[in-house]
């Protein structure tokens, strides 16, 4: 789990994002579409079209951070609000990254084998 700094908010970018993007273009999306400051220390979470891949970006005061996670099975649960950003708690982010429905936590699917 990514340690969320005290006072940092977690923002989910609704809709789909091109997962070929890196930190610079995701930061530009945060700035232009979400109207937030990508260097604020807050975490911004994006998902791909198939909903099995997410990317998180944040600036920790020393540099830009990019985290990527792909689920082996299942899909990331995402809000259906279009064109906006939704804020969630750090606990909900932990559920989200574990493949658990962060709105109604249940047991996660675990991989049974590697390869």
Predicted stretch roles:
Residues 1-115:
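Polybasic/polar functional segments that serve as interface/processing modules
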């Amino acid at each position: 789990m990514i340690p969320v700094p005290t006072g940092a908010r977690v923002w989910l970018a609704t809709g789909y994002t091109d997962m070929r993007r890196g930190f610079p273009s995701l930061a530009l999306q945060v700035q232009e579409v979400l109207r937030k400051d990508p260097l604020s220390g807050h975490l911004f979470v994006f998902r791909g079209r198939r909903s099995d891949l997410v990317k998180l970006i944040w600036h920790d005061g020393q540099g830009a951070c990019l985290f990527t996670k792909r689920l082996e099975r299942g899909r990331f649960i995402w809000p259906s609000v279009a064109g906006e950003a939704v804020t969630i708690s750090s606990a909900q982010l932990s559920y989200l990254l574990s493949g658990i429905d962060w709105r109604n936590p249940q047991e996660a699917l675990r991989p049974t084998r590697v390869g």
